[in-house]
A protein has these predicted regions:
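Conserved ATP-binding TGD loop and adjacent catalytic N/P-domain core of P-type ATPases
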Residues: 2, 6-149
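Membrane-embedded transport module
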Residues: 121, 126-195
Length: 195
């Protein structure tokens, strides 16, 4: 939200100044898209002071703000939510690393992120574009549907072939052919999906 820089000369404190961090242009739109994709709640975890965090959160329509947090505090908040839900965490700093490791899914910024955050995250946004997360959510949903289709289809066909084989209605070579066929159907099903 902002960066504080302290100035000293010859071991004497001369003052400090703050540089405001601006949110990325796509952040508000990104948060709205997340809601459309089933993400229930967005929560800000920041080490910055509460007043500034609240202003920032209002601009972005963030549901909940937790400010003035140390890395261990961020981890505690994340673990509280993780008891009842899956959590996804997006961060860029070294202070975000503990939460990134603990989260069910985490993203770091590749260009602006610290090395520790990049190492701790599950995914790295190479160009720091948050819309990459939306694409990841879309791909993971398609993948989940595909996996379920393949599992259910494979089990169903194998059970049918097993029953037919048990009653002698299908020869051994037919069962082997059906088994290979199930594998081919699963592969073809996977190939039909365009990501």
């Amino acid at each position: 939200i902002y960066t504080v820089t302290y100035v000293s000369y010859d071991h004497k404190y001369l003052g400090a100044f703050e540089i405001d961090d601006e949110e990325k242009e796509e952040t508000k739109e990104f948060l709205l898209k997340l809601k459309k994709h089933g993400i229930k709640k967005n929560i800000m975890l920041t080490g910055d002071n509460k007043e500034r965090a609240i202003v920032f959160a209002k601009e972005l329509a963030i549901d909940e703000v937790n400010a003035s947090l140390l890395p261990t505090d961020k981890l505690e908040v994340a673990e509280k939510y993780q008891k009842n839900d899956k959590i996804m965490f997006v961060g860029d700093g070294i202070n975000d690393s503990p939460v990134m490791i603990a989260a069910d899914c985490s993203f770091s910024m590749g260009q602006l992120g610290s090395d520790a955050a990049v190492e701790a995250s599950d995914f790295v946004l190479i160009n720091d574009n948050l819309n990459g997360i939306i694409e990841t959510v879309k791909i993971s949903k398609k993948t989940r549907v595909l996996v379920l289709e393949n599992i259910i289809g494979s089990i169903l066909i194998k059970v049918i072939v097993m029953i037919l084989g048990f009653f002698g209605l299908i020869p051994l070579w037919g069962a082997v052919l059906a088994d290979v066929g199930v594998m081919l159907i699963a592969v073809l099903n996977a190939l039909r999906v365009k990501i």
